[in-house]
Amino acid sequence: MIDLIGSKIKVLGHSDPSLIGREGIILFETKKTFLIQTQNKIIRVLKSNGIFEIYSENRKVILPGSKLVGRIEKRWL
């Protein structure tokens, strides 16, 4: 299990074009969303609609949001 809270994240692709390129720190996550602190504000982003670059535990991974949907405790990367 990998806890992504506190990890850096960047939105590489999303069904909402206004989110592409946004980056920040993951503050919280639910089964379907990330709560991200950007420079200016806190945004909620649907996982299933995006492609994300995540820096966690000294490594960078690029993942489709569909791989991140679900309960945190059941996720293995």
From Swiss-Prot:
It holds the Pfam family RNase_P-MRP_p29. It catalyses: Endonucleolytic cleavage of RNA, removing 5'-extranucleotides from tRNA precursor. InterPro entries: RNase_P/MRP_Rpp29_sf, RNP1, Rof/RNase_P-like, Rpp29/RNP1. It comes from the Archaea. The keyword Cytoplasm applies. Coiled coil: none annotated. GO terms for molecular function: ribonuclease P activity; RNA binding. GO terms for biological process: tRNA 5'-leader removal. Its EC number is 3.1.26.5. It is found in: Cytoplasm. Keywords: Cytoplasm, Endonuclease, Hydrolase, Nuclease, tRNA processing. GO terms for cellular component: cytoplasm; ribonuclease P complex. Part of ribonuclease P, a protein complex that generates mature tRNA molecules by cleaving their 5'-ends. Belongs to the eukaryotic/archaeal RNase P protein component 1 family. Consists of a catalytic RNA component and at least 4-5 protein subunits. This is Ribonuclease P protein component 1. It comes from Sulfurisphaera tokodaii (strain DSM 16993 / JCM 10545 / NBRC 100140 / 7) (Sulfolobus tokodaii). The lineage of its organism: Archaea, Thermoproteota, Thermoprotei, Sulfolobales, Sulfolobaceae.
